[in-house]
Design a protein with these regions (language model features):
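Generic protein-terminus/edge-of-domain signal
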Residues: 1-84, 100-105, 321-323, 329
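Ligand-binding loop in jelly-roll beta-barrel domains
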Residues: 82, 97-120, 124-127
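Loop/turn positions that initiate beta-strands
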Residues: 89-90
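A short, Lys/Arg-enriched amphipathic alpha-helix from helix-turn-helix/homeodomain DNA-binding modules
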Residues: 148-160, 174-178, 194-227, 232-236, ...
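Basic/polar phosphate-binding segments, predominantly the helix-turn-helix DNA-binding elements
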Residues: 184, 188, 218-265, 282-311
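Short amphipathic alpha-helical interaction/hinge segments
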Residues: 100, 104-106, 185-189, 193, ...
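Mature, function-bearing regions of proteins
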Residues: 316-320
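Amphipathic alpha-helical segments enriched in hydrophobic/aromatic residues interleaved with Lys/Arg
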Residues: 119-180, 184-189, 193-194, 200, ...
Length: 331
């Protein structure tokens, strides 16, 4: 088996697309557009980190803040992003929920007629998916605009139109568009043949390495398989040490930890659907016995599968009612 990075360079669109398909099928994402900001000269927007208490209070809602700059220029400070430029059409996502600040690129020029528009919202994923999301994505990521005519640009134009002059059912439509933004932005971040970039690493970066992308796609599609470290390394044609280094570098977790997070996320999703027995779900995600699955689920999620099915999977009430974004002025 090859060691180091031999044979791992270069893009493979098929593997990258397959990876994104599997991940989006695994994690249910809802969205809310909360605020539409009109930006003036010297504007600043600062948000504090999400607290552990807030995260615990919303068992079914791990919130990922996002910001879309429709017009103007900004500077961003966030976890892993320092003095990062943000331009019209860029999307800032905060999977880690950390403190962040956006501000006018040139606050000293207060006499200029500055104009800009910023959309602020959040993606909502089930709490059982929170660890996986934190492994898959960096704490903060800037998705650069692919340019005119791209899917991301067209989606943002529709969000802007609906936020500016909502039609019948506008609140519900904005909710669906905000949820779709998660997938469209990640597609742009993974390339999609366009010059979009993510300015931080994550497991999604494995899509750039054909061997690793193919391995992750097969892991996501065959959770019942008895995956071992030796088997994963052989599948990727890498040494065990190279495989471990690749995962640790991208996500800060080992291949085994990543596999466990994926299995628990899929199990929680199936439990919420409520159509299968606990034993059947455990078998489907790779556990030889119901008892072993029960122990693993409680250790990872903090409650038994039955408790999660009965109450832990309830939707955060704050995400149920669609509402139009509040409009406010900054600067």
């Amino acid at each position: 088996m090859a060691d180091g990075k031999d044979g791992m360079d270069g893009k493979d669109g098929k593997d990258g697309a397959g990876l994104l398909d599997r991940l989006l099928a695994l994690v249910d994402v809802d969205g809310r557009l909360d605020v539409r900001c009109d930006l003036g000269a010297g504007w600043t927007l600062a948000q504090a980190a999400q607290t552990a208490q807030a995260a615990q209070a919303a068992l079914a809602g791990h919130h990922i803040p996002f910001h879309v700059l429709l017009d103007g220029d900004a500077v961003v400070d966030a976890d892993g992003l320092r003095e990062a430029p943000m331009r019209a059409g860029d999307v800032l996502m905060l999977p880690g929920g950390g403190a962040h600040q956006l501000r006018d690129r040139d606050p000293a020029s207060l006499r200029r007629p500055a104009e800009g528009t910023l959309l602020c919202g959040r993606f909502i994923v089930p709490a059982a998916s929170a660890k996986l999301i934190r492994a898959l994505l960096p704490p903060a990521m800037m998705v650069r605009s692919p340019g005119p005519g791209s899917r991301l640009t067209r989606l943002l134009a529709l969000m802007r139109e609906e936020a500016d002059a909502p039609g019948e059912g506008g609140a519900a439509l904005l909710r669906h568009l905000s949820g779709a933004l998660f997938a469209v932005a990640l597609r742009a971040a993974m390339g999609d043949g366009l010059p979009a970039t993510v300015e931080a690493p994550g497991v999604l970066a494995l899509g750039a390495h054909p061997r690793l992308a193919a391995l992750v796609v097969d892991m996501l599609g065959n959770l019942a398989r008895d995956w071992t470290l030796d088997g994963m390394a052989a599948h990727a044609a890498l040494s065990r040490s190279s495989l471990i280094r690749a995962f640790q570098s991208a996500a800060g977790v080992s291949p085994a930890e990543f596999l466990n997070q994926v299995r628990m996320t899929e199990a929680a999703r199936r439990l919420r659907a409520g159509r299968e027995s606990v034993a059947a779900i455990g078998d489907a995600v790779g556990y030889a016995s119901e008892a072993a699955f029960q122990r693993a689920f409680k250790r990872e999620i903090g409650m038994t599968p039955a408790a999660w099915r009965d109450g832990g999977a309830e939707v955060d009430p704050s995400t149920n009612n669609a509402a139009l974004p509040v409009r406010q002025r900054l600067g």
